[in-house]
């Protein structure tokens, strides 16, 4: 009986968690306070930077569906937990 109850609780938890969208920081610039709820299917947060930008002014953060290949002098970091791209 306890096993059945535990199984039902686990199924309910997985169902509830799977329906939530990812939340990522979304902004341009060094300091980022704005949070964005990502669209369905966008399960990654990213931080895109220009290499050699000393002050971090060319930094973009947001949500992504897939990983892109960085161009020359670019660095893109991806993560898959809420608010991980700070």
Swiss-Prot record:
Gene3D superfamilies found in the cross-reference section = CD59
Main subcellular localization, coarse class? secreted
InterPro entries named in the record: Snake_3FTx, Snake_toxin-like_sf, Toxin_cobra-type
Signal peptide (UniProt feature, chain positions):
1-19
Q: Name one GO cellular component term.
A: extracellular region
Source domain of life: Eukaryota
Q: Which Pfam families match?
A: Toxin_cobra-type
What UniProt keywords are attached to this protein's entry? Disulfide bond, Secreted, Signal, Toxin
- Its protein name is Toxin 3FTx-Thr5
The lineage is:
Eukaryota, Metazoa, Chordata, Craniata, Vertebrata
């Amino acid at each position: 009986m306890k096993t059945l109850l535990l199984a039902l609780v686990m199924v309910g938890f997985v169902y509830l968690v799977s329906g939530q969208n990812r939340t990522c920081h979304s902004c341009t610039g060094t300091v980022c306070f704005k949070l964005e709820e990502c669209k369905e299917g966008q399960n990654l947060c990213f931080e895109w930077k220009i290499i050699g930008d000393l002050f971090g002014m060319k930094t973009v953060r947001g949500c992504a569906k897939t990983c892109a290949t960085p161009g020359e002098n670019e660095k893109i970091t991806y993560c898959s937990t809420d608010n991980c791209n700070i």
